[in-house]
Amino acid sequence: MNNYTPPYKITSKILKLSTQISEELTKLQFTGVEKVNPILRKKNRIKTLAGTLEIEGNFLGEEKITAILDGKRVLGTVKELAEVQGAIKAYEKLDSYRYDELDDLLQAHKILMDEILTTAGSFRSVNVKVAEHIAPKPSIVNELMMNLFSWLKNSDEHMLLKSC
């Protein structure tokens, strides 16, 4: 086992926010979240998919995602449509993924990106830079991820903080 711990500091703001989130989760547990209207569930699913895709620069939007879920054809680039289909498939399997299993992360990545990347389901093999951030070299990504997942599996930290 390694001694890796992600670099973070628990501040009073983090404690306050995590307490508020825990309180809201407790309320949901006692109000029966399973009883949520199926139409509301579908709307929330569409909003989640749209938000996830927008982060990656896909702006097909809620209307087109709704149409895709309803089995209709929509206009978009091959990549945009593949991203939507991949996100839908990955979200459908969400309950089967284990948060502390690296293989599950790679499987989710494969499902999500299978139509887009020939290397879907594996770590990158090239250098990348996002804005001013230079990511770690490809040769150490596997080790870094193994360390992170070992921490996720073995840390006594509260699950809410681990999820950040």
Model segments located where?
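FIC/Doc superfamily catalytic core
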Residues: 1-164
